[in-house]
């Protein structure tokens, strides 16, 4: 028997996803308006953490830079898949958090890729020479961490919240 789709099935998933998308898009709007032109950097802790406005045509942390037009379609496929999954399958709270964060990141960066052909990155950890990233990337990584944590609990004792 097919499971019916319901937005009410996993409320935390939807709340996290919507909040994450809004925060990501507002942060990128702020960066694009306050830090113009591209390349502007503001040291918050000089040599350690800066806001640096860059345009990324690649994936997270600038992987596949310049040749990744397919990423917008991947973002769309992941987003549609997660929406269908969360609308049909009851999930534990930690799973809702994880999948909601991943959806927020996929949609946040997907919006940028479809509208502009690039993603705005601005979080710049210079102390460890880490690639510049954005809140959507953070959201995806939080989601992965939450799902990994949830995987430590056996499915047989799984209690849906």
Curated annotation (Swiss-Prot):
Stated family: Belongs to the peptidase A8 family.
EC number: 3.4.23.36
InterPro entries assigned: Peptidase_A8
Pathway connected to this protein: Protein modification; lipoprotein biosynthesis (signal peptide cleavage)
Any GO molecular function: aspartic-type endopeptidase activity
Its membrane topology: Multi-pass membrane protein
Gene Ontology CC terms, in alphabetical order: plasma membrane
Role summary: This protein specifically catalyzes the removal of signal peptides from prolipoproteins.
Family matches, as PANTHER family: LIPOPROTEIN SIGNAL PEPTIDASE
Transmembrane stretches, start-end: 11-31, 44-64, 66-86, 100-120, 135-155
EC class: hydrolase
Catalytic activity: Release of signal peptides from bacterial membrane prolipoproteins. Hydrolyzes -Xaa-Yaa-Zaa-|-(S,diacylglyceryl)Cys-, in which Xaa is hydrophobic (preferably Leu), and Yaa (Ala or Ser) and Zaa (Gly or Ala) have small, neutral side chains
GO biological process per UniProt: proteolysis
UniProt keywords, alphabetically: Aspartyl protease, Cell inner membrane, Cell membrane, Hydrolase, Membrane, Protease, Transmembrane, Transmembrane helix
Protein name: Lipoprotein signal peptidase
Catalytic residues identified in the record: 121, 137
Gene that this sequence comes from: lspA
UniProt-annotated location(s): Cell inner membrane
